[in-house]
């Protein structure tokens, strides 16, 4: 009887290549996210610690531009991403990060440096824990997506309303719900990004998806940080 030809190393080699590709993809996502956070932090710190510049922005009607520009940028980015090159998408994300830095500069005028650092550290720990869980869990998190997105929309609408009514009680409720929603979104997005890699690996769009994944995780982290700062921050 003839024995079939066997290639015992083929399956293992293919699995290793897939694992290496996934790691490279996720590292690309987190690298872009990290660069975006650095840009945001530098811009926010520079404006927040330059009184004349901060007064020119937040002491005039320009503050409304600073508040709403990031939201407008996200919508623009989402609708234009398919027509952008990978390099163009990456530069647009970095530009958005700078715009977000202008918007976040106001925290340096309201909260102490120590409480800002504490909220950032807490957000980083929570974000990393949920990202790791989302990456490693075998549980399907996609079923939670609709609830998390509805929660996100609710937070967005309530936050816009509270800009004009200025209710501290409403702000606290938004922040508490926001912490839950954005930690959940972090795990959900990481698993989604991982799944999308397997669907589009080898295609040119995969590189662009690194940028979109970075934007999603960046927004989760920044919003989680803001919610924690609102809850725990010590005011000047």
What role is predicted for each listed range?
Residues 1-236:
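A hydrophobic alpha-helical transmembrane-helix feature that marks the membrane cores
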């Amino acid at each position: 009887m003839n024995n079939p030809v066997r290639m015992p190393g083929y399956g293992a080699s293919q699995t290793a290549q897939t694992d290496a590709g996934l790691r490279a993809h996720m590292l690309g996502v987190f690298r872009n996210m990290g660069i975006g956070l650095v840009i945001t932090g530098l811009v926010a710190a520079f404006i927040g610690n330059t009184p004349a510049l901060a007064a020119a922005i937040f002491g005039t009607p320009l503050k409304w531009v600073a508040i709403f520009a990031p939201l407008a940028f996200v919508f623009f980015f989402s609708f234009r991403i398919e027509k952008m090159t990978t390099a163009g998408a990456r530069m647009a994300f970095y530009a958005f990060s700078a715009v977000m830095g202008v918007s976040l500069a106001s925290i340096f005028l309201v909260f102490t440096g120590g409480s800002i650092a504490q909220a950032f550290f807490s957000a980083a720990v929570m974000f990393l824990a949920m990202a790791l869980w989302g990456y490693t869990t075998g549980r399907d998190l996609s079923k939670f997506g609709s609830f998390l997105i509805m929660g996100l929309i609710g937070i967005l609408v309530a936050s816009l309303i509270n800009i004009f009514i200025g209710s501290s009680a409403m702000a606290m409720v938004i922040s508490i719900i926001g912490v839950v929603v954005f930690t959940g979104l972090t795990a959900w997005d990481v698993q989604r990004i991982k799944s999308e890699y397997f669907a589009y690996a080898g295609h040119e769009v995969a590189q662009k998806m690194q940028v979109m994944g970075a934007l999603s995780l960046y927004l989760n982290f920044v919003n989680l940080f803001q919610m924690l700062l609102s809850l725990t921050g010590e005011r000047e």
